[in-house]
């Protein structure tokens, strides 16, 4: 894989990457097993930071429109606020997938995107003067194919992933005869310790069964059921207003990741991730609206959605604008923004 110079529309227009932003771009590879699309990685390093503790990855979905959005992902102020609070970098890939091309060729990290991602961390570490970037933990957010990618990275690299938010896309754990182009993953025991949130719109098969994206819920349900049955730290949050768009899910995603990173990131860069404590967790019915302390949950805990703390994953909260959120969402977001402005 080599650094690329030429760009093809619509991937030829994007913001400049001057410090604290840095960028690398790799050409498509013709080697078996390597990434067949060009890819552009942009990273933001919080100004003045001496030692990074992690990297937050904002991963787009499939198709030209979504892939193109990755060109500006590292410039998002909400995500920068989260990154700054935890001494993390913010990384946004942009896979230059043609509109009709097979998304699996990048959203399955085994098809070369996983290796390209790890390579970019080393190259960006050198550019930014932060050698620790190549080894710090990852916090992953992904939409659609990006959720498939983020979930795949949890299964392939559980010891590197602090937490993962999967919006409208998840990897398969069992082969699906109806989706022969998608390869199943295996579920290692170590992945059960990684906090994961499955987040989707209700129109993606939860209450609306004839939507174009109605197959999203069965896939999420299958992943959730298998992981939770084995004691995995996985939850479900359903947005009652959206379909395959992202809606207002960031208002919960950022706060959920904040909770996970506050617990899991090592105090000193280079040390191992901390395990999530068993005490303090909350449980909820997967498509329900309220969560309760785990010890007060009266249903089957192995079928219940898991939350790291008292964050209430109500379906109403995920969909409602920030000014109407009940506690603790608005104060948490406000604190993050205050951190970013200092």
Residue ranges and their predicted role:
Residues 4-55, 85-86, 138-159, 181, ...:
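A domain-start/cap signature at the N-terminus of enzymes
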Residues 46, 58-62, 93-96, 141-145, ...:
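Active-site-proximal beta-strand/loop segments in catalytic clefts of secreted hydrolases
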Residues 49-101, 173-174, 206-208:
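Short substrate-entry loop that stabilizes the transition state in hydrolases
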Residues 51-55, 85-91, 134-137, 158-163, ...:
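Loop/turn elements at helix/coil->beta-strand transitions in domains of secreted/extracellular proteins
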Residues 67-72, 101-106, 151-153, 175-179, ...:
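Short, solvent-exposed loop/turn and secondary-structure capping segments
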Residues 105-132:
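Alpha/beta-hydrolase active-site loop
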Residues 162-251:
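The feature captures the conserved acid-bearing segment of alpha/beta-hydrolase catalytic domains
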Residues 230-232, 239-341:
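Alpha/beta-hydrolase-fold serine-hydrolase catalytic core, especially in secreted/extracellular enzymes
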